[in-house]
Amino acid sequence: MITIPSHEFTDLLNEISKKWQEEWSKNRIFEADPKDQKKFFTTVAFPYPNSPFHLGHGRTYVTGDVYARFMRMKGYNVLFPMGFHFTGTPIITMADDVAKGDKDLLDIFQNIYEIPADVIPKLSDPLFMANYFKEDIKAAMREIGLSIDWRREFTTIDPQFSAFIVWQFSKLQKKGYVVKDTHPVGWCPVHNLPVGMHDTKGDMEPEIGEYVVIFFESKMGALAAATLRPETIFGAVAVWVNPKATYTVAEIWGKKVIVSEKAAEKLKFQTDVKVLEKVSGSDLLKIVAINPITGKEIPILPADFVDPTTATGVVMSVPAHAPFDYFYLKKAKVGIEPIPVVAVEGQGDAPAKDLVESSHPKNDADLKKLTEQLYRLEFNKGLMRSDILRLVKDELRAELSVVAGKQVPEARKMVTDILIQRKAGTKMLEIMNKPVYCRCGNEVVVKILQDQWFLDYGNPEWKAKAKKLLDSMRVIPEETRKDFEYALDWLQKRACARTRGLGTPLPWDKKWIIESLSDSTIYMAYYTLSHKIKEFGLHPSQLTEETWDYIMLGEGDVKAISERNKIGVDALQELRRHFTYWYPLDLRHSGPDLIPNHLSFFIFNHAGIFPENLWPRGVAVNGFILYEGKKMSKSLRNIVPLRKAIRTYGADVIRIALSSLVDMSSDANFTEAGARAIADNLKRFYELMQMQDGSTIDGTPEKWLRSKLHRLVRDVTPLMESMRFREVINELLFNLSSYINEYLEMVRSESREYNRDVIREVVETWTKLMAPFAPHLTEEMWHQLGHNTFLSLESWPTPDNSKINDQIELEHEYHKLLIEDIRAILNVYKGKPSSVLLYVHDGSLNQVVKSALDVLNSGGTMKDFMQKNTPKSKEEARVLQRIMQYVTEMPETVKKLIYSNVNEMEVTRKGVPLLRYKLNLEIEVLAYTQEVKQKLNKDALPYRPAILVK
């Protein structure tokens, strides 16, 4: 076998990749058109071209391509297109940062992405940036081997695509799904624009949640304490403020209140705020507050853990049910006792106290975990204590009596309603996953937006359709379905237009531009005919609402539409034919961060516009990529550009690492050591292809290897179908390599050469199975094996079940077990061994062993076994006990051999050549007899021979 040095193999991989990318492009093998063949239409989210691709981007695209290539080999006519998302604020904001001379960004562009110095200033022009990075991303996609039909490429600012978006929004408006309303949104206070996931740094979706604000009256005004657990107000024994923060006395919510300075600034975006004066947190410690439910005076205490930027910056202290509160009250030694409010069966009166004192938290992070644990427990299992009414002031007791004994969720709503009715509380909105930053660098706040256009995802009719679509859709992995269900439930009104950014104007209110997560929900439909729109030279003015109604929905008179829009009937029918052939979309690939936004919007918009037969059929979600165990980030300077990684390791190595290191839903950790291990295994198979000599002997080793190969084909095919790529690669790259090593040892043990035909069969089959993962190397190997077709277009292997031989595989596994047992004895053997004697049982106990296995398999016990096989003597009882102990530890291989009824002596003798070769000792196989037992004082059982080392 020829051995190639590792560094030379990487160079070879890059040469091979370039060669076959050019061949695929030249021969246009991934261009897909309607034909008399079952179709498979798949897409991956098109990228924002505001920076080059890094390793983290690659996983979703490669995973999508692996599956597309697999389906192509399974006989499907596969369409995998790509476009580019120019609209929205990501590109404009990044260009602004270049124009401002953002040092961190310029450093990353120059020193990590290696963008030429003369190009960087030009990136301040948004369109230059978009087009420059579009070409760079396209190059990365080609270099990583994506099997894309590039004829269909478009950008979201192409006028023809804008005409499609106009149609989409006109349909939604007519159905009542686009509304003008007042609603909370994430908001950039600098740009004065709504902010969604793709407008933020790190692509974080601003999650808007609700705090209940409870007014604790004081001589300076009401301390506005924000809480997520208003039902625990009965046990509030103090108010926390941050002594180092600045607070304001202000008129908010129609009364004089005290909130942090930061809170007052944020609340201006939700309600009227009039600041009267500023006070320090330490000044507030000099006054007392009144619990509005109990009427008791309670102290105001200092707490550095109170974040003045979160909610109101004022927190009530409930030490019975808040681990933070109990921990810090105890530390402050103020002598305040917890007051229990919520009861959980099996828990003490003050569960926060019990948790803290049993867990010994070392820091705030530990306290946060305990808090989440207790909050979850009490929310799900807690009941309001009946004795809380003794805490309530007289005038509220009757009104609050309904709360006693209620479950926590119900009590929470009741208490909130009563507080608001009594003007003792209100609600405020907050970014729950704060801090979230706009791409311009400013922190996002919540704004109550008036006269804004929204997609009304809370519309009951629309929501029901979306849920029906999800129910009909395949979700990979299935466990992410619950995340989709939660998102569809949670979504309400969503701002769908901006006054800034690239994009399509709202057709009925052109001062607004449709935002980037709203114009990217049904664009997959546009792929089906984008190349034909170019081919026919259609102008946006021809792509009217009735034109799209005909193409997408089959509505209208084609001749009349043709005449009015000056599009030939044949062209319209051709566009309709292409759309109806490819749609619905079969599979959509994306990341988990897009479930609560893009992927849910994708479901809603398809459900809202298209009939059920055109609803998407599936969605696949994969986890993120870590680099050497850490998230890639600018601050860590560990961003690895995708094109650089390809040059360093080879495209196929990167493809395998990105798609197959872990299960789909898990985050994958890319490491240099892991990449090298993948490269070494690829090299091993490439070198195996060079094994041209060998013999034509076709014996047991060949039958065994063919059996393992065809079993592997049979097993990995359903794994591929369910996108369990980690398990597939484990079989193809690691297990199959082990099988080949075992086969070569088997033939060497027979003092002969390998069979060249079986090696070729293994290599040919492997190239097909690995083609979706390592398309470049396998294409090269396929041609070196003498084929002149494109492997990418070959059929997926089918197993020959007649070649799967369970018995031969079992016998070989048994021989390996014997080797392990002998080695275990040799490890403790004193002296130099020369031979091993194996004394094989005569099989007289086989039926008894089967009986023990039957009892065990049916859930029986030793007692059941003894009743079934009544011993006639103490010796028989001892043997039966040994047998039962034996079968409880018996390997699966031996169990199968026991049931197969083959002759143990024959099976053992077949393994002698391999045992001799592996152990480098003489092996003798002898019959186990009573004389042997008495002479050697050794026991044997079926398939557990007595072993004697000489």
From Swiss-Prot:
It is an enzyme of class 6 (ligase). Keywords: Aminoacyl-tRNA synthetase, ATP-binding, Cytoplasm, Ligase, Nucleotide-binding, Protein biosynthesis. SUPFAM superfamilies: Anticodon-binding domain of a subclass of class I aminoacyl-tRNA synthetases, Nucleotidylyl transferase, ValRS/IleRS/LeuRS editing domain. The keyword ATP-binding applies. Its EC number is 6.1.1.4. A motif ('HIGH' region) lies at residues 47-57. It catalyses: tRNA(Leu) + L-leucine + ATP = L-leucyl-tRNA(Leu) + AMP + diphosphate. Its main location: cytoplasm. GO terms for molecular function: aminoacyl-tRNA deacylase activity; ATP binding; leucine-tRNA ligase activity. GO terms for biological process: leucyl-tRNA aminoacylation. InterPro entries: aa-tRNA-synth_Ia, Leu-tRNA-lgase_arc, Leu-tRNA-synth_Ia_arc/euk, M/V/L/I-tRNA-synth_anticd-bd, Rossmann-like_a/b/a_fold, tRNAsynth_Ia_anticodon-bd, Val/Leu/Ile-tRNA-synth_edit. A motif ('KMSKS' region) lies at residues 631-635. ATP binds at residue 634. It is found in: Cytoplasm. One of its GO terms (cellular component) is cytoplasm. It comes from the Archaea. Belongs to the class-I aminoacyl-tRNA synthetase family. This is Leucine--tRNA ligase 2.
